[in-house]
């Protein structure tokens, strides 16, 4: 990310900076002053200490990026936003014509956050109607997760689906029809550290489901049912996920066109390989 784009001709503003790691890297590489905007006072304090220790020209600015007065900090600066989530990157584009920023370097992330019930396009010609669930699809993948994490996530999903299968069998009507589908709240991680029977028992107690006496062999059956359902869900997901990258590309191009319509010269591309982060799309904009 730091290597993409030309050397900045203006001071930098790091948007949603955390501890300001990116800002310090850019200040060191480009020899420019950096202001790092972050809402969390603890992160601001930690960033200021790191900048002082490294003797780098970096100012930590504790402010809310979504507040109206935050736009005043953009004037005359080039804005860098690495994985600013949802409305945090969209607000930069919406205010671009009046913010007075010299340029933008934006790698968007978590497109669904702050979108409300429906996505509001950033460019005039965009007409695709997207709801929150569709936006979430753009970031639903585990490219960077280690193999053992993927196995654990698959097992957790199978256990949850196994419980649903057991619950549906217990609560089915006399006509044999399954009950209406319903979800349940996230489960504590500790419930997933034991065995399948213990997991189902704890979840049933919380959900008010009265389970019959279940033998060890029957637990194995319901666990296998969960795995079967997981594989079925996986097949359906493969169809949906075929559109994932295209959807994300559309969202990034909407961002790029939004900046172009606000009188910026714009480029869009990638800044790293997807194995480092699947959110590797970048928009560069200069006056």
Regions found by a protein language model. Name each.
Residues 2-8:
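Conserved alpha-helix/loop element of class I SAM-dependent methyltransferases that forms part
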Residues 9-16:
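Conserved class I S-adenosyl-L-methionine
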Residues 20-31:
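Conserved SAM-binding loop of SAM-dependent methyltransferases across substrates and taxa
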Residues 33-38:
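Conserved SAM-binding motif I beta-strand of class I
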Residues 47-48:
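Conserved SAM-binding loop
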Residues 55-65:
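Conserved SAM-binding strand-loop segment of SAM-dependent methyltransferases
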Residues 66, 70-287:
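Class I S-adenosyl-L-methionine
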């Amino acid at each position: 990310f730091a290597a993409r784009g030309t050397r900045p001709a203006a001071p930098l503003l790091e948007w949603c900076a955390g501890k300001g790691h990116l800002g310090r890297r850019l200040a060191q590489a480009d020899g420019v002053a950096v202001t790092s905007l972050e809402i969390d006072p603890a992160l601001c304090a930690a960033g200021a200490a790191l900048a002082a220790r490294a003797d780098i020209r970096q100012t930590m600015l504790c402010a809310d990026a979504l507040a109206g007065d935050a736009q005043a900090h953009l004037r005359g600066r080039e804005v860098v936003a690495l994985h600013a989530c949802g409305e945090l990157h969209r607000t930069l584009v919406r205010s671009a014509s009046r913010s007075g920023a010299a340029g933008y370097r934006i790698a968007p992330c978590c497109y669904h956050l702050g979108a409300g019930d429906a996505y509001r396009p950033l460019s005039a010609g965009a007409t695709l109607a997207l709801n929150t669930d569709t936006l979430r699809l753009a970031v639903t993948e585990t490219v960077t997760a280690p193999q053992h994490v993927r196995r654990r996530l698959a097992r957790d999903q199978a256990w949850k689906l196994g419980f649903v299968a057991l619950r549906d069998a217990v609560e089915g009507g006399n006509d044999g029809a399954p009950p209406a589908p319903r979800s349940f709240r996230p489960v504590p991680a500790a419930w997933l550290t034991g065995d399948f029977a213990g997991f189902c028992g704890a979840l049933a107690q919380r959900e008010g489901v009265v389970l019959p006496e279940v033998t060890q062999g029957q637990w194995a059956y319901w666990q296998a049912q969960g795995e079967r359902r997981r594989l079925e869900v996986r097949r359906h997901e493969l169809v949906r996920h075929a559109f994932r990258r295209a959807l994300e590309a559309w969202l990034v191009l909407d961002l790029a066109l939004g900046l172009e319509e606000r009188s910026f010269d714009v480029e869009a591309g990638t800044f790293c390989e997807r194995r480092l982060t699947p959110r590797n799309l970048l928009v560069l904009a200069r006056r």
